[in-house]
């Protein structure tokens, strides 16, 4: 069993593609994933990039995935340290890094800048690893 942390970018891509995750994989994310996804999809609808119906379909797809959502004190403390170490202005991305450090085998992100920034802290895997 391989445990992957996914962010909202990956969750939205999986929903868009209606991807089937291989059964031996486990998905994890910080609890903030839900709010970030909701916000990103809302913004896309406001910009006219998709319909509300499409956004709701993607939300429902992700809600149907078996993603373990975590957000405890230990995660927050490790996220704080990671954000400080990397000089980031906030801790949002650091929560994904911290969760990977604490509970996962790799972080899956579509963000090349994030992948480059964290490559010395966690293993980064391509989205194709999930299929």
Task: Identify what each model region corresponds to.
Residues 36-41, 58-61, 78-82:
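A general alpha-helix detector
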Residues 49-72:
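Short hydrophobic interaction/assembly module
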Residues 17-18, 40, 120-121:
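Residue-level signal for well-ordered alpha-helical positions
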Residues 1-34, 44, 48-57, 130-131:
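Short, well-structured N-terminal submotif of metal-dependent ribonuclease cores
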Residues 13-14, 36, 78, 116-117:
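Phosphate- and divalent-cation-binding pockets in alpha/beta enzyme and binding domains
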Residues 67-113:
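Active-site neighborhoods of divalent-metal-dependent phosphate/nucleic-acid chemistry enzymes
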Residues 34, 99-131:
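Acidic, PIN/NYN-like endoribonuclease modules and their adjacent C-terminal/linker elements
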């Amino acid at each position: 069993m391989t445990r992957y942390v996914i962010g909202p970018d990956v969750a939205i891509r999986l929903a868009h593609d209606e991807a089937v995750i291989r059964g031996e994989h486990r998905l994890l994310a910080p609890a903030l994933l839900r709010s970030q996804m909701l916000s990103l999809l809302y913004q896309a609808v406001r910009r006219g990039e998709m319909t509300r119906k499409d956004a709701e379909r993607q939300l429902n797809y992700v809600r149907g995935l078996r993603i373990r959502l975590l957000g405890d004190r230990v995660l927050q403390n490790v996220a704080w340290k990671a954000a400080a170490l990397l000089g980031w202005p906030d801790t949002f991305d650091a929560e994904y890094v911290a969760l990977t450090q604490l509970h996962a085998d790799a972080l899956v992100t579509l963000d090349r800048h994030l992948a480059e920034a964290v490559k010395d802290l966690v293993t980064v895997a391509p989205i194709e690893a999930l299929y």
